[in-house]
């Protein structure tokens, strides 16, 4: 289970957030309030955190899930602050594109979850982001 805009920081200790049977994984916003991403992974799942797909200026957590008798699966939990937010870096889109290119080049099924602050119902909203996702073979579900 992934949570975007977790609003966690170093004042929130993991022991108070722990759920029995799950491992808490966090990527808190480094500067300012709000934002952040956290994921609860079941203890019985075989997975590995992919720090190589996480960038300091993007709020995300990437995991590789190892499934018996199947290819591994990449899952990215991403939070993109809204346009105009002081927390949305100027190079978010290019950094995000680099991460997606790296992830999809691994020939693994890839799931991207989270909040990209992109309204798919408006055809004019974030055309470049939509083109990028389509180019990478990712579909909005």
Model-derived regions, located:
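A shared catalytic/ligand-binding motif for oxyanion handling
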Residues: 1-141
């Amino acid at each position: 289970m992934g949570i975007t805009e977790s609003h966690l920081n170093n004042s929130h200790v993991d022991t108070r957030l722990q759920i029995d049977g799950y491992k808490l994984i966090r990527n808190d916003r480094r500067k300012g309030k709000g934002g952040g991403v956290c994921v609860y992974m079941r203890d019985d799942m075989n997975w590995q955190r992919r720090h190589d797909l996480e960038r300091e200026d993007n709020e995300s957590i990437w995991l590789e899930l190892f499934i018996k008798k199947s290819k591994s699966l990449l899952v990215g939990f991403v939070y993109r602050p809204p346009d105009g937010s002081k927390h949305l870096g100027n190079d978010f889109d290019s950094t995000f594109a680099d991460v997606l290119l790296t992830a999809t080049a691994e020939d693994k099924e890839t799931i991207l979850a989270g909040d990209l602050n992109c309204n798919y119902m408006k055809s004019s909203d974030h055309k470049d982001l939509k083109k990028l996702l389509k180019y990478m073979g990712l579909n909005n579900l």
